[in-house]
Amino acid sequence: MSIRTMAAAAAAGAIFMSAAGLAAAAPALSPGDSGLEEVVVTAQRREESAQNVGIAMSVLSGQSLVEKSISYVNDLQNAVPNLQVEPAFGSSQPQFRLRGVGFIDYTSNNTSPVGVSLDGVAFALPIQTQGQLFDIDRVEVLRGPQGTLYGRNTTGGEINFISNRPTAEPHAGFSLEYGTHNELDAEGFVSGKLAEGLLGRLSVATEQGGAWQRNRVTGQSLGDKDKIAVRGQLQWDPTDALDFRLGVHGAQDKSDEQGLYLLQPFTPGSGPPAIAADSSRYATGWALNPTFAKLIGINANSKPGLDNSNDGIDLTANIDFGGARLTSISAYNKLIRREYADWDATQFNDSDEYLNSDLNVFSQELRLASSRGAFEWVAGVFYSNEDLHENFYSDLTDRLGGIAVTTYEQVANSVGVFAQGNYQLTDTLKATLGVREDHENRELIGLNTAFLPGAPSLTGGALGGSITSNLPSGKAELDYKPLSSTLLYASISRGVKSGGFTAHNTVTAPAADPFEPEKLTAYEIGVKSDVTRTLRVDASAYFYRYRDQQILGKVFDTTSQSFIGRFVNADSRISGGEIDLEWHPLAGISISQYVGFAEGYYTSKLLDVPLDPTLPPVDYNGRPESFPKWTYGGDVSYTWNVGAFSVTAESNYSFHDTYSQFFLLGSNDFTIPKYWLANANLTLAPASGAPWTVTLWGRNILDKSYDLTRNFFLPSSEVAAAGEPTTVGIRLTYKY
């Protein structure tokens, strides 16, 4: 059976079972009922219905995030079409792809073409996005280039998280859940009026325990969480025309690192016997070299783990001038990353890694927006300064006879000027035009890799370089509303991403050469329609022309006699589409489904150099890109009354298609097989509306074995990061 047929059958089956199987028990919608709720978003920096915005987007409420077990940004790939978030070697370095547009790198210094922001503050680098999601009002995932309305420019899209705001009335609540592997999670908030015109909100969350992996040699567990995060907000409204919101957040993560398992047998550098490939995805291995442990400053008996912190402060001010509104967003964020990982997944010191990163980011945005009318406009400027210091330690003793230490600093300054206007040509036709100009200077300082004394030495000294980019982008769109409940839109947009550097552990001169900015021209058409008061269907189709796409290539370095990764630029084409459906056929029944399709091909000369210098290079011109063609998912829920209680049964599921990472990893087969995931929730609440609920939940209830990524650091060790097995638990929630 084809993937297309499977997706259609699953969607039809879910809808049929919910509608037909529950019809006898569920009452029909009364004339006063509204089957569909209006979803209000701020994707265009104004509050408006998502159905009136000509952007393909997915919007998930805070409650939906809980039901779908989305506790951090990576989990969104199980709820959004054409989105993948791959953890580099299972680490806290996420690699985002949206509609096939992404950037694959295990180091910290390069930006992502998929932007992520919290409360209007954009994260500069992907490593900043790995905090807990808690006390969230909603998340908006915008597909396609963004940048003519706010903040940073993106080629792939934008993920915007909006937290719950302070309230005038006193509110408080908590949730407490316990699950398999002794995992204990808790979250709470308190909100209310502090003084006349001054509101406050304090939120806190923690995750503890949950180890699900085992050391194949010692039997030690791995995977315990140890996270805590806090967010405070003050909202001050001194006048009707002036308001301020101050946000402060802090997070600490001392969790175990996810372990990797062996895809293929591993032969130590010191010789046989080999370690067999793991029969269980939940097996792993590690052991610290005492010399390496002393160098990085941790105990020699330590498990792979993190000691990361992510703190920040932001101030948003709004001044209403009557005909226009001025918004200022000032933010400072600091991230400290201390992460020990074993990327060979054995007790040998073949690829043991330690990442020591310090990142400071300051950003300032000024935006002036008109009031509502036939002509609506917004214009602004965005400034960002990033300063990253990173030390990357690699214990290669068993394979290469030493410990490599890579150090560098990267400083980036960027300024973006943007403007967009919408004009209502007729009652049913609206035109949009947006422009943007970005200027960025990115400088790499002191890139150097050295082996400890007495071990083989790499030649060369500290390297450096800089790249300055001036990048125009823009958007043109037409919206047509033949009916009040239907929007048709067509757009042409251009997104850009700045160039950068390959900051891997090499001191060969080409490593300091910058790669060029990438440019993407997107053509898109779409429809958003409330077909009936109980059925909503949104669909989009797109075609991308990608110039100078940034790709991690592979070359053979004659100095170190091993493969090294180096970013190169190539052209490609990507096309695809999405369909989102929401249906409330009967009172108490809610069904949502999505399907996404994406395929891409390289369209320029792109050479991969084999390890064996006697073999000719491989040209990937015309070959497919590395991302899944099909994504599918949805959820079905049914709520009914049983005596004095309300019961809700909910199930959500997702499908991820097969894809190969052949270009990044050469001729070896690192294909990630397709997989299905399913979760379920059963919630009991008082029918009277009392403020407590009890939920029994299950994640990966079909106990599917699947991989999040497959890779190698040195060719001797082919590894994968597995997804979590089945877990079950109970959650108690109380809010007033």
Give the predicted meaning of each segment.
Residues 94, 111-113, 125, 134-143, ...:
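Outer-membrane beta-barrel translocator/receptor signature
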Residues 16, 34-169, 525:
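Acidic, small-polar-rich N-terminal luminal/periplasmic segments of exported/outer-membrane proteins
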Residues 191, 361-380, 421-424, 523, ...:
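Conserved C-terminal beta-signal and adjacent last beta-strands/turns
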